[in-house]
Swiss-Prot record:
Keywords: Mitochondrion, Transit peptide
Localization annotation: Mitochondrion
Lineage: Eukaryota, Fungi, Dikarya, Ascomycota, Saccharomycotina
Protein name (Swiss-Prot/TrEMBL): Altered inheritance of mitochondria protein 46, mitochondrial
Species name: Saccharomyces cerevisiae (strain ATCC 204508 / S288c) (Baker's yeast)
GO molecular function: heme binding; intramolecular lyase activity
Knockout consequences: Increases frequency of mitochondrial genome loss.
Amino acid sequence: MRLISKVLVKTNCLEVGMRRAPQWYSHYSTTAGNARVNKKGSKVVPVLTGLALASIFAKKWYDDSQIKKADATSVAVDASISAFPKKMGPPQWPFSTQYELIGKGVRCVSSITFKAYGLGIYVAAEDKHLVSEVLDSKFLSQAFIDTAAPPSPENSHQDNLRAALNDPAKAPILINNLLDSGIRLMSKNTPIKAGSFKLLMDGTKKSVLKNPDSQSQDKDRLEAGFQELHDCFRSVKGLVARDDDFFIELNKDCSMNLSYYARKKDEFVILGTVKEPLIGKLLFAHYLAAVDPPSPEARKEVIDALVSLS
């Protein structure tokens, strides 16, 4: 089992790997050589071991006693992983802003019976107003939402919005307009089964390509974006433990900040940024508008949240 060799920290204006601690969390910092820093500021000596030794650590690797149960500030997603915080942001978490959970569920791979990840979708608290500004706009209401002629007195705008967000033809249009508004979102992917960083990278790429709109995009831009995604994972290799977290922050310009939290070691790793906006937009549109989304449960809860915010 090979573990992460270093923690790379940056602020919004820094490139990954520069040795400067972010102002919003002063005890996150890089250190000389291959040492790492945990959330408590303690120096951690890197440990290297072979994949063949993974079974020796199986008991600790799957220690259920470390799983955090739901409380007033969190919600349960699956019994095998820690509850998801309702709010995440500085100073406890080194993200760009404060986020609030709007949807959660289990993400299945290959078979509906194989639970791979817990998926949480968060919205920036400062950007919640954009939901009503976009989805209540006169143009979208008349063209895609409140389209019944004559208008039905039995259905409110919220009823019509819910129906439109569940419509395979209308949902992508509405969600893409919302993403174009500059709304900031974040996904939290928590493995239910131990995996690898390669699986995280490949799964992210596959989710982008599953969006039908990816077929009509500029192939050179897509490939450049996928190369940026690949570059983000150059600094990490090996296994990803159950109950660790992989975060994807969608910025206003649809670029993405990628990061990873090793729960048992209490370490936060800045993986890098995918600057190509096509990748971020296609990925989050797939999360929120796909006919076959990664987590139907999470998408349903997101729709409920968007309707309540409109």
